[in-house]
């Protein structure tokens, strides 16, 4: 997890179907319109869940991890985000040599009642050599 993830409180809460299950605890800084979770916070959670799913799929040592850069991101907002904890989990559809395709879902009360979903294509770049 990176600094941005910690700033909005995202952490790994466990696994779901073998993929990391992320939680974004509710905080006042995540409020958009009164009584609603900000769509940008939800989209950020979806992106981080996609990266976590890919990272868990790749067989890399911790010090040699790849860098993931979004190529295309499509987010569907299905329900209003309530002022409560939000969960997300990604499913890696395909990982190629340079591109990964991931489907991600975010929910609050039940995984069967998604508040948002995303399809993402991310470029996989090797970590730059330090020198």
Where are these regions (language model features)?
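Conserved small/polar residues in nucleotide/adenosyl-binding loops
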Residues: 1-5
């Amino acid at each position: 997890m990176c600094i941005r993830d910690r700033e909005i409180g995202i952490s790994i809460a466990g696994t779901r179907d073998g993929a990391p299950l992320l939680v974004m605890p509710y905080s006042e800084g995540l409020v958009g319109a009164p009584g609603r979770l900000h769509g940008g916070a939800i989209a950020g959670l979806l992106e981080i869940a996609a990266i976590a799913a890919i990272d868990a799929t790749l067989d890399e040592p911790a010090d040699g991890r790849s860098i993931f850069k979004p190529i295309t991101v499509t987010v569907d907002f299905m329900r209003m985000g309530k002022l409560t904890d939000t969960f997300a989990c990604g499913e890696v559809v395909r990982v190629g040599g340079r591109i990964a395709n991931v489907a991600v879902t975010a929910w609050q009360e039940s995984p069967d009642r998604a508040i948002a979903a995303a399809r993402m294509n991310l470029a996989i770049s090797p970590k730059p050599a330090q020198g």
